[in-house]
């Protein structure tokens, strides 16, 4: 009986103990980005099959949890998996994987984590590049990079803008940045790169970023990385864009009314005759009115009077205002004169259409990316347009676990037609001059070439125009040809070989051929070429480049120490060829705009060829401790064919360091501060972006009575050498409030020494001057780059950016 009671007591105790040990846990899972619930997140007791998912409110309940289970695992696609200690009531904040994934920058000869980078760089991604309909890929950087200045000179479609990074660094040498396309220096031109093919653009600004590119990187470097395929099923992307362009600039406040223009011109002449010539007010009144509409430009004559008024009266009254009896419109020499709006006639709404198709995919070993693009852009000025066809094929293959190779080839064909300069004439022509020729009934006259335009010459119209005579930019844009056609073939290949665990050898080879042909045909009917019976000039140029790189990388980590070393050699060869010829007296202007369509030679034929070579040895060492302290050293020894052999080699370096303060324990309590990083760099680079052969005397070959003769052209100076840029960069990077507010503030100081300038000498020496390293220049300023995200939900993200710089 006692045994039975004891057994019952034990069973009851065990049952009660088990019932008391079961735990129920409730909780909520939210996103760190927007504090919204994460719906459908998996919540699993670690080491068991006991799990559930969150409901529409992000809430979950787990029951029957054993006291031996201390941890739950929370996971969701696109978010960082978390292991959390079990509590009765839980609030779990999940972080997006894209948020914790550290940004990787494309830098000189490779990539670098943004946190480990000690230099100054800005990276733009494909989303920012393709969201705007830009013809030139570099236009996507407009307003995106602090310290980058972009200038468009004429607004022609297909125009290549000029770029400055942190100001002008030289007065004589070129100041444009180096373009690097997929790791290789690129000479093909911005327009030959289809923006739809671009994955990212990195702008490198300081010496720590650009020193490895040596002399060619002295003015900054812009690295363009094209898209690559990823393993997986084939993916086809089709993109079509249509847009319209109109004139965007606001007009200056200038006189547009013909009456107001005559009044202003009269007042100037009246004051001249009254004050400078000593005439009486009545005399000055008559002189100003008479000479204003006269044909002598030396006395202020405008030649054209487009108002009719009673005989015996003057156009401008003694009160300085237009005669109230004057009416717009006047017949002169069989033509009806009335002014036109030249500006409105010059511009029109231009249509733009762009189509892109790309196919990508592959296996774990081989991937392929292929693309085709077509662009047709009309210019806002009559006679201007741009047409482009692009194609790209990019492949990679993992042949062995230790060997990978690939190739990248692209082709671009473009045709650009430029306007005949109607912009300047439209804004420089007074509002009293007609654009068209009209008969006595006021109707625009016609000839075999369509509407007849007033060129301001009496043999083809009513009168001689003192301003821009024998010219009408709008009609010339319809007839004259300013055509550039180009073909660019660019290709590169690489092979990576990994050996001895931490070593990788890379061989890169890149070549490009850019072939361009420019044709300028001036019509024989009107304008300056009328007396020549038309003219034609043709220019052809070709640029061929070859770039070879051999790079050895070593990467090793031991404990909290990380070391990365790189050594390499690079050679670059550039051959430029140019051919030019011109003729007059064209036989059939519309049917044959070639040199064989003209019969009169101009003795203006020439050809030219130049070669430019560089060679460099490079080294970079990078070290960091615990992802907290960073140090970088770069060195390059460069040689350039643009200097005398005695001064051909130069040594350039950079040193950079960075410190991430938020990884220090004494900042752990500041929860709103996500990142605080200090960085500093200093370095020197050379600049050889000068003309060829400045170190030798040059001569012109002349025809002297059919005899060969030489004429002195330019005095050389064998002592010229590299312009040297010394760069200092000090910056701070920060992120606050879970990445809602981020940015950087940087101070830079760039000093150019041994700047190349022309040095004038007395003409008695037989020449006017020569080039020498005699100048200095200093650029310094502050760059601010801020980003704020006020709204970030699942469907809407609102970014506010602010960028500015001083110089």
Region roles according to the model:
Residues 645-649:
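Short glycine/threonine-rich loop-to-helix capping motif typified by GTGT followed
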Residues 226, 357-361, 391-397, 491-497, ...:
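Residues on the lipid-exposed face of transmembrane beta-strands in outer-membrane beta-barrel proteins
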Residues 31, 55, 182, 638, ...:
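Acidic active-site catalytic centers that drive phospho-/nucleotidyl reactions
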Residues 115, 231-338, 349, 379-384, ...:
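Surface-exposed loop/interface segments of Gram-negative outer-membrane beta-barrel transport/assembly proteins
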Residues 1-392, 397-399, 404-406, 412, ...:
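Short, small/polar-rich motifs associated with maturation and membrane association
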Residues 364, 368, 617-635:
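Short, contiguous hydrophobic alpha-helices characteristic of membrane insertion segments
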Residues 502:
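Active-site and adjacent substrate-binding regions of carbohydrate-active enzymes
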Residues 372-378, 631-640, 790:
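Transmembrane beta-strand segments that form the barrel wall of outer-membrane beta-barrel proteins
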């Amino acid at each position: 009986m006692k045994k039975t009671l004891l057994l019952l007591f034990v069973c009851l105790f065990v049952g009660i103990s088990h019932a008391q040990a079961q735990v129920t846990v409730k909780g909520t899972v939210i996103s760190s980005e927007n504090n919204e619930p994460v719906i459908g997140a998996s919540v699993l007791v670690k080491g068991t099959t006991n799990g559930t998912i969150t409901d529409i409110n992000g809430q979950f309940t787990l029951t029957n949890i054993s006291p031996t289970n201390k941890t739950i695992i929370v996971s969701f696609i696109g978010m960082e998996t978390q292991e959390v200690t079990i509590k009765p009531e839980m609030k779990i904040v999940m972080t997006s994987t894209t948020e914790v994934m550290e940004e990787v920058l494309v830098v000189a000869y490779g990539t670098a984590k943004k946190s480990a980078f000690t230099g100054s760089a800005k990276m733009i991604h494909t989303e920012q590049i393709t969201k705007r309909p830009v013809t030139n890929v570099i236009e996507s950087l407009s307003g995106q990079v602090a310290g980058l200045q972009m200038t468009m000179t004429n607004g022609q479609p297909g125009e290549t803008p000029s770029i400055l990074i942190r100001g002008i660094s030289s007065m004589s040498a070129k100041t444009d940045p180096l373009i690097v396309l997929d790791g290789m220096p690129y000479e093909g031109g911005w327009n030959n790169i289809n923006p739809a093919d671009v994955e990212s653009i990195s702008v490198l600004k300081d010496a720590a970023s650009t020193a490895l590119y040596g002399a060619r990187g002295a003015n900054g470097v812009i690295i363009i990385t094209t898209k690559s395929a990823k393993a997986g099923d084939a993916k086809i992307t089709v993109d079509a864009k249509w847009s319209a362009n109109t004139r965007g600039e606001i007009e200056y406040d200038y006189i547009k009314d013909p009456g107001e223009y005559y009044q202003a011109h009269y007042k100037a002449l009246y004051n001249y005759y009254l004050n400078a010539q000593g005439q009486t007010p009545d005399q000055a009144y008559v002189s100003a009115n008479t000479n204003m509409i006269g044909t002598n430009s030396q006395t202020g004559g405008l030649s054209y009077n487009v108002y009719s008024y009673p005989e015996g009266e003057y156009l401008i009254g003694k009160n300085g205002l237009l005669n109230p009896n004057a009416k717009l419109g006047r017949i002169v020499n069989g033509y009806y004169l009335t002014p036109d709006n030249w500006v409105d006639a010059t511009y029109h709404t231009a249509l733009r259409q762009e189509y892109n198709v790309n196919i990508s995919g592959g296996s774990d070993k081989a991937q392929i990316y292929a693309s085709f693009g077509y662009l047709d852009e009309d210019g806002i000025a009559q006679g201007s347009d741009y047409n482009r066809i692009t194609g790209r094929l990019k492949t990679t293959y993992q042949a062995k676990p230790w060997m990978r190779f690939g190739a990248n080839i692209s082709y671009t064909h473009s045709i650009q037609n430029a306007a005949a300069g109607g912009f300047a004439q439209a804004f420089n022509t007074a509002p009293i001059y007609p654009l068209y020729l009209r008969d006595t009934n006021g109707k625009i006259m016609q000839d075999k070439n369509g509407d007849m335009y007033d060129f301001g010459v009496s043999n083809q119209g009513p009168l001689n125009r003192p301003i821009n005579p024998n010219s009408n930019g709008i009609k010339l844009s319809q007839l004259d040809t300013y055509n550039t056609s180009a073909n660019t073939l660019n290709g590169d290949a690489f092979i990576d070989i990994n050996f001895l665990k931490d070593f990788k050898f890379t061989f890169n080879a890149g070549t490009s051929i850019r072939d361009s042909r420019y044709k300028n045909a001036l019509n024989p009917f009107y304008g300056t070429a009328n007396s020549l019976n038309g003219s034609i000039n043709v220019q052809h140029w070709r640029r061929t480049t070859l770039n070879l790189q051999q790079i050895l990388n070593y990467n090793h980590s031991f404990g909290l120490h990380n070391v990365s070393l790189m050594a390499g050699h690079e050679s670059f060869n550039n051959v430029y060829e140019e051919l030019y010829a011109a003729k007059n007296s064209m036989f059939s202007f519309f049917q044959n705009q070639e040199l064989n369509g003209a019969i009169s030679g101009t003795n203006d034929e020439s050809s030219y060829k130049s070669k430019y070579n560089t060679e460099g040895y490079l080294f970079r060492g990078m070290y960091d401790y615990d992802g907290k302290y960073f140090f970088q050293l770069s060195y390059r020894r460069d040689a350039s064919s643009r200097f005398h052999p005695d001064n051909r080699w130069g040594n350039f370096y950079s040193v950079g360091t960075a410190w991430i303060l938020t990884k220090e324990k004494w900042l752990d309590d500041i929860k709103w501060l996500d990142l605080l990083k200090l960085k500093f760099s200093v370095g020197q680079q050379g600049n050889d972006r000068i003309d060829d052969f400045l170190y030798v005397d040059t001569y012109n070959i002349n025809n002297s009575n059919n005899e060969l003769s030489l004429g002195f052209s330019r005095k050389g100076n064998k002592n010229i050498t590299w312009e040297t840029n010394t760069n200092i960069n000090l910056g701070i990077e920060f992120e606050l409030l879970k990445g809602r507010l981020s940015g950087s503030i940087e101070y830079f100081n760039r000093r150019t020494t041994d700047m190349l300038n022309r040095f004038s000498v007395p003409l008695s020496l037989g020449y006017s001057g020569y080039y020498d390293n005699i100048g200095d220049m200093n650029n310094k300023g502050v760059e601010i780059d801020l980003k704020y995200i006020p709204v970030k939900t699942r469907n809407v993200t609102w970014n506010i950016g602010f960028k500015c710089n001083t110089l």
